Amino acid sequence: MERLRNSTPRKILWEEFLIPMEISQYRLSKDLEIPQTRISEIIKGNRRISADTAVRLSAYFGNSAKFWLVLQFDYDIENEINKLSEDIERIETRGENKKVVSNKNLNKS
């Protein structure tokens, strides 16, 4: 099964928001009123973006909490598909939509 290219929420936060806006992790954590370790762990890839963090990021950057949660959700799903790809291929699909579950088809939504 082909591996998916997976854009990480941490990479988007770092490269698309913090670097261009010249915002440090420290400044972001202070402005969001959260521990600095939370942002640091997200940037390192050791922590997921929670609903709480998503709401705070959306208020700060002027986008929606769903933007951040969907980034995290898509990342998590793609990781699981890649991790379970061999198992998924062995599962026989029941019903009319044979082999709907694949990297190619799941990535379309």
What are these regions (language model features)?
Residues P35, N46, F61, Q72-Y75:
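The DNA-recognition helices of helix-turn-helix-type DNA-binding domains
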